[in-house]
Design a protein with these regions (language model features):
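Intrinsic disorder/low-complexity detector
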Residues: 9-15, 37-40, 61-63
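Glycine-rich loops and low-complexity Gly/Arg-rich segments
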Residues: 2, 33, 61-63
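Alpha-helix boundary recognition
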Residues: 3, 29-30, 55
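Polyanion-binding surface elements
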Residues: 1-24
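Major-groove DNA-recognition helix of helix-turn-helix-type DNA-binding domains
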Residues: 16-44
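A short, Lys/Arg-enriched interface patch at domain edges and termini
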Residues: 50-63
Length: 63
C-alpha cells in the first residue's frame, strides 16, 4: 500500500498519502486518532499505525 514510503512518516508524507492539505494533516496528527511521536518540533507517524488507521476508517465507513 505504502511501499515507496519509509517506515516512519512525517506530516508531509501523511499529507501525500491521504491527499489532504497541510493544515488538515496537522489537524489529523494532533487529533489523537492515532499515536504520533514528537521529536522536538518534528512529528513522526509509524507507517503501520497509519495503515491500521486507514483500514479502520474504511471499515467504519462501510457500516
Amino acid at each position: 500500500m505504502l511501499d515507496n514510503y519509509p517506515d516512519v512518516l512525517n506530516v508531509s508524507d501523511v499529507q501525500r498519502v491521504l491527499g489532504i492539505g497541510r493544515k488538515q494533516a496537522y489537524e489529523l496528527v494532533h487529533s489523537g486518532n492515532f499515536h504520533v511521536i514528537n521529536i522536538g518540533k518534528r512529528i513522526k507517524v509509524s507507517k503501520s499505525v497509519l495503515i491500521k488507521w486507514i483500514e479502520g476508517e474504511k471499515n467504519n465507513h462501510a457500516n
